[in-house]
Amino acid sequence: MVVSDGGKRVKLNVGGEIFETNASTIQSSCPDSLLAALSTSTSHGSNPVFIDRDPEIFAVILNLLRTGRLPANSSGVFSKQELLDEAMYYGVESLLRLAMLPPPLLGFDASLVSTIVPAADGVPSALTATAGDASLWIAHGGQISVYDWSLSHAGTVRTHLNDITSICRVWGEAAAIGSGSASGLHFYDLSGGRYIGSTHWTDPEDPRIHKARVAAVADSEGGVFASFDCLHRENSVLQIDKSTLQVAAVIGQQSGNSAKTTVPEKLRWLPAKGLLVGSAVQRGVFGCSGYIRIWDPRSRNIVWETNEPGSGRSTRFGDALADMDVDVEDSILFKVCSKSGDLGMADIRKLGEDPWVYMSDENPGAWKAGDGGGYSVVHCYRKQVLAARGGALEVWSSVKEKTSGDPIRRRNFVDKEDDSKRGMISKIEAGGDRLFVSRECMEGVEVWETSSFSGVVSVE
């Protein structure tokens, strides 16, 4: 390496090719890297230090140092792993990571970029992307495959279960998993493939509570929440101590002999309020029925609930919820109506007998009530509500009304018509500005991102 002009210009010999840049370019971008250390050295005389690495990949790395971005054609020439290996060698992995991560997810401007297919038993049964670092855990069969922030395969862990229907990251690299065919909530350390322990719901005074299976899992700082369902349909939500894996509290035990008392199939924790939200929906030839319920784990009491059909305004009777989710940041409940397709929202801070405000989109091209297929999955992510209807994927986004400036919500398709023909959407997850979608009886998980070349759009 040669440093000249008062230390401003640097020459590098990489694989026999000479590269020239400014020392400030290297030192300002990655001051603790190998390149920064070499750029401050002046003891090599007039000959640049020879670095025995691929010069073509280094050209990409140098462009990254100069601009903070990867060249547009780099993804088609080099694999992610090749770029990562070189970035780690030069000590600029953090810079490459920032460049490779997708821009903020805008559902109405997202596109399918890849499909992740596990090597064996490729049909996903559960997935989670809640870590926020763009990583993904896929449960398939009795295995869990881990994909890091670059979606590179980091490893697969074989569990003792034949199938996994619930998965949740509870701390570090530890997963809490449940099965629809085996009792108990089980904990695994995925970094080393180590079984940690299990939690079971039992009651010596009630023989009906036996071999309870897990239907849903949610994590919180104070513990893990899991809904359990027994063969006799007795069900409840357990609060589990992370340090001991022992049951800390039994919340909302019920008989499960009607749609209003079935086991919660979805759990969401609201850290700002210290509340737990659960829901269950049953679908039949006459439509949907179910409930949304909010518990305070401190008192173990229900603080609010709604049952559908059977509550709310009469004009909405028969248009029961198809699914619900929670905007954790703004403490807002969202539900999508099974017949009209309208979106209902309720401020958790102002709940009452009928707190729902309904939004419909008058755009005739966005949705028609006569279209076949009802809603099956709803997921909230960064002020956006993603809803699957059959094989189609829609998003409700918050925008400002031009005249009044008040926030309103608009519905748009995320996918194209050809995308919706690939199969019924069964699961939606989002994390790290990526959208993950799986379809019934289809191998793999679709990865959707907003293009880096899309125009900047403000989403409130």
UniProtKB/Swiss-Prot annotation:
Identify the residues that the record assigns to the BTB domain, covering every copy.
Answer: 8-74
Question: What pathway is it annotated to?
Answer: Protein modification; protein ubiquitination
Q: Say where the protein is mainly found.
A: cytoplasm
Q: Where in the cell is it found?
A: Cytoplasm, Cytosol
Query: One Gene Ontology cellular component annotation?
Result: cytosol
UniProt keyword Protein transport, yes or no: yes
An example GO BP is: protein ubiquitination
Gene null: resulting phenotype: ABCG36/PEN3 retention and accumulation in the endoplasmic reticulum associated with an increased sensitivity to the root-penetrating pathogenic fungus Fusarium oxysporum.
User: In which tissues has expression of this protein been reported?
Assistant: Expressed at very low levels.
Which InterPro entries does the record cross-reference, listed alphabetically? BACURD1-3, BTB/POZ_dom, Quino_amine_DH_bsu, SKP1/BTB/POZ_sf, T1-type_BTB
Q: What does this protein do, in the record's words?
A: May act as a substrate-specific adapter of an E3 ubiquitin-protein ligase complex (CUL3-RBX1-BTB) which mediates the ubiquitination and subsequent proteasomal degradation of target proteins. Confers resistance to soil-born pathogens (e.g. the root-penetrating fungus Fusarium oxysporum) by regulating membrane trafficking, specifically mediating ABCG36/PEN3 exit from the endoplasmic reticulum and subsequent relocalization at the host-pathogen interface of the plasma membrane.
UniProt name for this protein: Protein ENDOPLASMIC RETICULUM-ARRESTED PEN3
Q: Which organism is it from?
A: Arabidopsis thaliana
